[in-house]
Amino acid sequence: MSTGTVVQVIGAVVDVEFPQDAVPQVYDALKITGEGACNGLVLEVQQQLGGGVVRTIAMGSSDGLRRGLEVVNSGSPISVPVGTATLGRIMNVLGEPIDEAGPIGEEERYVIHRAAPSYEDQSNTTELLETGIKVIDLVCPFAKGGKVGLFGGAGVGKTVNMMELINNIAKAHSGLSVFAGVGERTREGNDFYYEMKDSGVLDKVAMVYGQMNEPPGNRLRVALSGLTMAEKFRDEGRDVLLFVDNIYRYTLAGTEVSALLGRMPSAVGYQPTLAEEMGVLQERITSTKTGSITSVQAVYVPADDLTDPSPATTFAHLDATVVLSRQIASLGIYPAVDPLDSTSRQLDPLVVGQEHYDVANGVQTVLQRYKELKDIIAILGMDELSDDDKTTVFRARKIERFLSQPFFVAEVFTGSPGKYVSLKDTIRGFKGILNGEFDHLPEQAFYMVGSIDEVIEKANKKK
């Protein structure tokens, strides 16, 4: 273990000088020693500048750092605890417990920088994962071992949707989950912990947080820390769920670090290594012949612009994309999933079956036609439409409302009990609407219900 000294501090970036024959490698973890608030602060090597000097990023607050402090090279990258000891615990980017429940007591640690599984180790799966959320199961079904992105601007419900998915899948799937909170609000991390505790699945979830108020180094690496824990469970032959909230903050932390390291920015001010950084993370989130990682990632869309380089780069890596729309949210329809923008590779007759495919296609066709007719209705009114178009509009409005659903995790602030709808009931309900079986029912009856049977019951009560 070689020792060096701090020679320059620029915010979260720290330059350290080592003897010429003992220069640390890129990604090695260094530790500040000596007195003061910074004792034990971990630095990660990012660049070798020559002359024995390395440029590092601080994995904590650099307040109180000064030139001349002694730094020790650990000789390996940052490592985190893995295995069952992490379940039910909240950790930071370094794998240190932050829940005041004592030491983790792990038997094994993994380094966070690891190679992605090779081609021959990867497995291809087409098994569907039922979520119990109608709009998702119908239009953009998830694959077990697949990657899903929840895209949306500020305040359209990404975190609530993710919490509902965790609630539904973690309970039904009864597998293990890892939750990586990347640059999100501490309040949400706190809410998530108590949500898991109240629903009795805390002992199946490992939580790693690098929140909004932490330095960019933490936010950049916390996703890798969470992923490393998930990889351990996968390599033991288990099926793991990896939840990342929010992938955009991971990109943003990379942008901050890149600027601090003096790299020239690329489009919209993002780091020039955006695609590579995203690829390094996403390529590791994959299923092998041993076990699977099913990942759900929230992706913040800046200014609701899906062409922004960050969400656009993320799109390429996903099997299913769930796009949340502000326009749909403004109508009071939750979950505010846009059935025309959301896509899934699984929506194929060979995977989901012909009936499911036809119903999903029919729903999208009717909604698309309604979208086209809206301008005519706004200018000329409903009376100018043909009988066929009128029927399409009435059915589309019922479909729109039937796509809404009360959530378990939202019970506290909506007052209505959550509903889990099986895929079979979802297909039956939408097929009935498309075939005109429920044309006689008022459209209000379709709003915020579970299965089609509840619609009939609600309509009968209103008579």
Swiss-Prot record:
Judged by the first EC level, this protein's enzyme class is: translocase
* Binding positions (ATP): G152, G153, A154, G155, V156, G157, K158, T159
Q: ATP-binding as a keyword? A: yes
Q: How does it sit in the membrane?
A: Peripheral membrane protein
UniProt-listed Enzyme Commission number(s): 7.1.2.2
What does the entry list under GO cellular component?
A: plasma membrane; proton-transporting ATP synthase complex
Q: Which cysteines are joined by disulfide bonds?
A: none
**What GO annotations for molecular function exist for this entry?**
ATP binding; ATP hydrolysis activity; proton-transporting ATP synthase activity, rotational mechanism
Show the CDD domains listed in the entry. ATP-synt_F1_beta_C, ATP-synt_F1_beta_N, F1-ATPase_beta_CD
Domain of life here?
A: Bacteria
- Carries keyword Cell cycle? no
**PROSITE patterns this protein is in?**
ATPASE_ALPHA_BETA
Subcellular location per the Swiss-Prot or TrEMBL entry: Cell inner membrane
Self-association and partners: F-type ATPases have 2 components, CF(1) - the catalytic core - and CF(0) - the membrane proton channel. CF(1) has five subunits: alpha(3), beta(3), gamma(1), delta(1), epsilon(1). CF(0) has three main subunits: a(1), b(2) and c(9-12). The alpha and beta chains form an alternating ring which encloses part of the gamma chain. CF(1) is attached to CF(0) by a central stalk formed by the gamma and epsilon chains, while a peripheral stalk is formed by the delta and b chains.
The function of this protein is: Produces ATP from ADP in the presence of a proton gradient across the membrane. The catalytic sites are hosted primarily by the beta subunits.
Q: What is this protein called?
A: ATP synthase subunit beta
Q: Which organism is it from?
A: Shewanella sp. (strain W3-18-1)
